[in-house]
Amino acid sequence: MYSIKTDHKLMPRERLIRLGPEKLSNQELLAILLRTGNKEKHVLELSAYLLSSLDSLADLKKFSLQELQRLSGIGKVKAIEIKAMLELADRIQIAGQAVADPVLSSAQVAEKMMIELGDKQQEHLVAIYLDSQNKIIEEKTIFIGTVRKSIAEPREILYYACKNMATSLIVVHNHPSGLTKPSANDYHFTEKIKRSCDYLGLICLDHIIVSKHGYYSFREKSDLF
């Protein structure tokens, strides 16, 4: 259970200024984001209440906007601010993981994409375009929804490859189920995109399936490459 601060003489904002953000508790940091409490709860009590409803801090990402609003004291505005904060934190983490050096392995790409796609509740199909030195030119989300619908036509993947004048590409998609074992459709799609790349003189380096818990690389584990 998160403790509730009883000394309100030095509020979280003042403590952050004096001590730095790393010295504040999760309760205090969340209180700064919430800004105000309500008629029933002081802002520190409200942040403690929200945190006490979680098994771990990471569970905060699992709340939908509607679920946050249903929590006592968390209205629409506060729920929106929390979701925006979580999304921004994700983007900062992703930016920090950006691959500036050459891509050297499927495991390197998989680790990056597990962070980006591991928690997604819908399937995302992403293409990573590389230059002749295996440096990333662009990472493009091609499709969100049901990957099967995108399997029929790899033309959009190839369009951006040509637009970026890429030498090679890596295709990644996630399995929200958490299981990374490829389906028959995944095999069919891999064969199709590889043939299409060969036809255009592009190199398809890999097709990687990721989840929160791991990844499957067709290059590492199948005979398609």
UniProtKB/Swiss-Prot annotation:
PROSITE patterns: MPN, UPF0758
The UniProt record lists the keyword Zinc: yes
Family: Belongs to the UPF0758 family.
Biological source species: Streptococcus equi subsp. zooepidemicus (strain H70)
Origin organism lineage: Bacteria, Bacillati, Bacillota, Bacilli, Lactobacillales
InterPro entries xref list: MPN, RadC_JAB, RuvA_2-like, UPF0758, UPF0758_CS, UPF0758_N
Signal peptide region: none
Binding-site residues, Zn(2+): 173, 175, 186
Protein's recorded name: UPF0758 protein SZO_09140
Gene Ontology MF terms: metal ion binding; metallopeptidase activity
Gene3D superfamilies: Cytidine Deaminase, domain 2 (3.40.140.10)
SUPFAM superfamilies to which the protein is assigned, alphabetical: RuvA domain 2-like (SSF47781)
Pfam families hit by this protein: RadC, UPF0758_N
Residues of the MPN domain: 102-224
Motif (JAMM motif): 173-186
Keywords for this protein: Hydrolase, Metal-binding, Metalloprotease, Protease, Zinc
Highest taxon of the lineage: Bacteria
Listed GO biological process terms: proteolysis
